[in-house]
Every structure is written in C-alpha cells, then in structure tokens.
Regions:
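Short loop segments at secondary-structure junctions
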Residues: 12-15, 73-74, 98-100
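Hydrophobic ligand-binding cavity/cleft-lining segments
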Residues: 1-42, 47, 152
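Beta-strand/loop substructures that line and gate deep hydrophobic ligand-binding cavities in soluble
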Residues: 81-134, 141, 150-152
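Amphipathic alpha-helical segments that line or abut small-molecule/effector binding pockets
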Residues: 16-19, 133, 137
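Generic recognition of short, well-ordered alpha-helical interface segments
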Residues: 13, 30, 47, 64, ...
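Glycine-rich portal/gate segments that line the openings of hydrophobic small-molecule binding cavities
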Residues: 39-86, 134-152
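Hydrophobic/aromatic beta-strand elements that line small-molecule binding cavities or substrate pockets
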Residues: 7-9, 40, 54, 65-70, ...
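A generic structural signal for beta-strand entry/edge sites
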Residues: 2, 49, 75-77, 99-104
Length: 152
C-alpha cells in the first residue's frame, strides 16, 4: 500500500534564509513538535549518505525513524529516505525563489506502508496529509518570525 502526497507553501523570506533554518537540526523540534530527539549516526551531517535517528512521540507511542540523506543541492533541493517499522518514505524537498523575493517550498512524499499500517493508511490519509501541512505551516511561521525578530 502506497501513498503519495505533495505539499506546497509560500514563505515570506529569501531562499538562503529558508535553507539556513531548514538545514539546522536544532530547529527541527520548533516546527516538528512531536520530535523528541535527533541523533546523527554516520556520514557527514546533512550530506548524501548521512544517516540519523529521529525519535517521535506519537500520542504516547515512540516512533523511531532512520533518515538517510540521498541528495543535496544547496540551497534548492534535499532528498531523503525515512524508514521505520511501519513505513518507508521518500521525501524530496524543493526550494524555489520567486520574483517577489519569497521562497516556494514544495515537498513530495512517497510512502510505502508495512504490516498492519497498510490497512490503517486507508483510514489515516487525511490525518497524514494534515500533519504534513501543519508541520510546513509551523516551519513557515518559524522562518517569518525569526526574520521579523532579526532583520538583516
């Protein structure tokens, strides 16, 4: 059972600022509130073949994901795989400059569910999509708030 999801958001900041904030793992809990820990395991952090462990608290249940960076073209593209016992997810993030100085963040996710999650995913599609949209909106708010607090 697979699911594809594309989310797009316009951020009122230049691409370099968006990338800087997105690329800093210390910022992740600020826009992914269920993230409990991020631990680098191997490779050069943030670069292709780097492996990290992310631990989330999903309604009292610990979900451990292994992130592997698959591609990076700073400041416009970051791709990775995220594996857990419930799913394998490929996420590709594009950051595009607009003519107005904003940044369009386009995220494409391709999920392959495992075990009983193959069945559960049928009922959870809306909540999974909502969660992605909410995380991206929190990131937008983080960037725009930081920019307003620390103008160049």
């Amino acid at each position: 059972m697979g699911m594809k999801h594309k989310t797009e958001i316009l951020i009122d900041a230049d691409r370099a600022t968006v990338w800087r904030i997105f690329d800093d793992p210390d910022n992740m809990p600020k826009w992914q509130p269920t993230l409990r820990s991020f631990k680098h395991k191997s490779g050069t952090p943030g670069q292709p073949d780097a492996v990290s462990e992310l631990v989330y608290d999903e309604n009292g249940r610990e979900v451990v994901m292994t992130e592997t960076i698959t591609a990076r073209r700073e400041p416009s593209f970051l791709g990775g795989t995220y594996d857990s016992k419930w799913a394998s997810i490929v996420i590709v993030n594009h950051f595009e400059e607009t003519d107005t100085g904003q940044t369009r963040w386009v995220s494409n996710a391709n999920c392959r569910f495992k075990g009983f999650m193959k069945i559960m995913a049928l009922f959870m599609r809306k909540s999974i999509c909502y969660r992605t949209d909410a995380d991206m909106n929190r990131f937008k708010l983080l960037v725009e708030t930081e920019l307003a607090s620390n103008p160049s």
